[in-house]
């Protein structure tokens, strides 16, 4: 049986459990990090332990499917609210690149999500400042894009 390593974007069943279940009747054994090192909402996953998990599993893997949001920031929501330095994030990426060089036979399917701009004053999955400023920040981005793409109405330009 071929080993497929899965580093999902977060702990939700649609990302952590369902891909695993889909592969049960396939030629692949899917291995995932333990839930205790995965993210939970705004709480980042343990990036050091996630990298250690990848290092341990890649030696015998056929392929790796990994979320760069999880690898670099500890998860989807943590990628929106992190305070990690550039150097910290770059070091995580470099460590994965070292694994990639060590195991060139392992196919890597990496993905990331484009940052969204929530249009509500809700900081449940956003930085704390989003509660008072979310809609206004969304509107500013919307109007800037509209001005560039199609132009603003006089009311919008006021």
Question: Each PLM stretch: what is its role?
Answer:
Residues 1-158:
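An N-terminal assembly and electron-transfer interface module characteristic of large anaerobic redox
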């Amino acid at each position: 049986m071929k080993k497929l390593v899965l580093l999902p974007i977060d702990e939700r069943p649609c990302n952590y459990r369902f891909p695993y279940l889909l592969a049960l009747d396939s030629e692949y054994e899917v291995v995932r990090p333990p839930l205790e090192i995965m993210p939970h909402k705004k709480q980042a996953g343990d990036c050091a332990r996630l990298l250690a998990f990848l290092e341990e599993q890649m030696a015998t893997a056929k392929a790796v499917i990994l979320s760069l949001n999880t690898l670099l920031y500890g998860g989807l929501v943590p990628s929106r609210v992190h305070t990690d330095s550039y150097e910290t994030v770059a070091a995580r990426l470099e460590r994965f690149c070292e694994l990639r060089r060590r195991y060139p036979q392992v196919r890597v399917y990496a993905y990331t999500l484009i940052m969204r701009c929530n249009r509500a004053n809700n900081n449940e999955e956003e930085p704390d400042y989003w509660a008072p400023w979310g809609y206004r920040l969304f509107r500013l981005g919307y109007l800037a894009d509209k001005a560039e793409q199609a132009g603003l109405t006089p009311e919008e330009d006021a």
